Regions:
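C-terminal regions of RecA-like/P-loop NTPase motor modules
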Residues: 3-10, 148, 225-356
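Phosphate-binding/switch region of NTP-binding enzymes
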Residues: 51-57, 62, 171-258
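Conserved, well-folded catalytic cores of nucleic-acid-processing
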Residues: 70, 74-75, 110-113, 163-166, ...
């Protein structure tokens, strides 16, 4: 069971929060200013956050570089357009995955896309490389930067996973997304973050991916084209505005992203696709089972079959594998056949020494 923080406030403090949060029918509230678009489609407003998701090597960081270059220059880059107010022109770029050398390559790429000189630091862009710090310290540094940088309008966080110790922790995920909502509202900024997708499906990874899907203004997917591996395709998978037409880009000889103007979006097939019976041995990657079973048996052995099936649905769901009852039964059969789960009397027990 995950611990939850207990907030103890005085009645006066709670009353002040209530007053701040009360909506009045006679008051005037401004619509969130639009700051990022793809063509004529809104993907980002001040006071909200968005995300890019994609599998490894799908060119997510190249895509984000184009977003930043558009915001930095105020021009169209790839298909991104930006219109940040004059008092919201500062950009904070957080990289949690790469070292200083590779972060500098990203910075130079952004400047070239924005037609700015590489010989001096840009006035409106600050990049922080936080790879060496712990998740808790990374979060504290970002919170300090967001609160201290004047005229801040756009924050890039590449990637959000490195703010968490456990990507499947519901409490950690809720805390991070709550921070995003607080920062964007208090500072009236837009945050764009990056998260990997599961290897075996299109879902954003872990519980943090679920929280992003539920709360983000826009989720864009960056995917390598199935017919041409040199091309990456960007499309909206969750969006409050109307969907934009998917577009494609490739990396040219100068290691810069450039649009593929000849790309034609694939037609989405209507109706339910034909699919054979569920085969967990083939459809669930081997490396998913151990973390899933760690979650299933987190509280020890399970004595009831129905409880066991429900826990399988929950444990595999945390790994991005959605199971209904019938599929969970097939998974239970596989686990028994492979001696990954064994019977101890009437109990179901995890066998950590299994070989698969």
């Amino acid at each position: 069971m995950e611990k939850t923080d207990t907030i103890i406030l005085s009645p006066e403090e709670l009353a002040a929060y209530m007053a701040e949060s009360t909506i009045s029918v006679t008051s005037t509230y401004e619509h969130s200013p639009v700051v990022l678009m793809v063509g004529d489609t809104i993907i980002g407003t001040l006071g909200n956050f968005s995300a890019s998701i994609g599998k490894a090597k799908s060119k997510k960081t190249f895509n984000v570089s184009a977003i930043v270059a558009s915001a930095l220059s105020g021009s169209t880059v790839l298909h991104y357009r930006s219109m940040f107010p004059e008092n919201k022109r500062k950009i904070l770029y957080i990289d949690t995955e790469q070292g200083r050398y590779h972060c500098q390559l990203v910075l130079k790429r952004i400047l070239r896309l924005a037609d700015l000189p590489e010989c001096k630091n840009p006035d409106n862009l600050i990049m922080l490389a936080l790879r060496k710090f712990s998740p808790k310290l990374r979060l504290a540094i970002v919170e300090q930067a967001i609160g201290a940088i004047p005229d801040l309008g756009l924050v890039i966080i590449d990637g959000i996973r490195d703010f968490l110790y456990d990507i499947n922790s519901s409490s950690e995920s809720t805390d991070i997304i709550s921070k995003f909502m607080q920062w964007t509202d208090d500072r009236q900024i837009h945050i764009h973050t990056v998260l990997h997708q599961n290897k075996n499906d299109e879902h954003a990874r872990g519980h943090i991916g679920t929280e992003l899907n539920n709360k983000a203004e826009t989720i864009m997917q960056v995917e390598v084209d199935k017919e041409n591996k040199t091309v990456s395709v960007v499309e909206a998978v969750h969006i409050r505005d109307r969907e934009f037409e998917p577009f494609a880009f490739r990396i040219n000889e100068e290691a810069m992203p450039e649009p593929v103007e000849s790309y034609l979006p694939k037609e989405k097939k209507t109706g339910r696709p034909t699919k054979g019976p569920f085969n967990p041995d083939k459809e669930i990657p081997k490396n998913v089972h151990r973390p899933a079973l760690d979650a299933v048996f987190a509280n020890g052995n399970i004595s009831n079959y129905d409880d066991y099936i429900e826990r399988l649905k929950e444990g595999y769901g945390l790994q991005g594998i959605k199971l209904g009852y019938n599929k969970a039964v097939k998974v239970a059969t596989l686990l028994s056949d492979k001696q990954m789960v064994i019977k101890e009397g009437k109990d179901y027990a995890f066998n950590p020494e299994y070989h698969y």
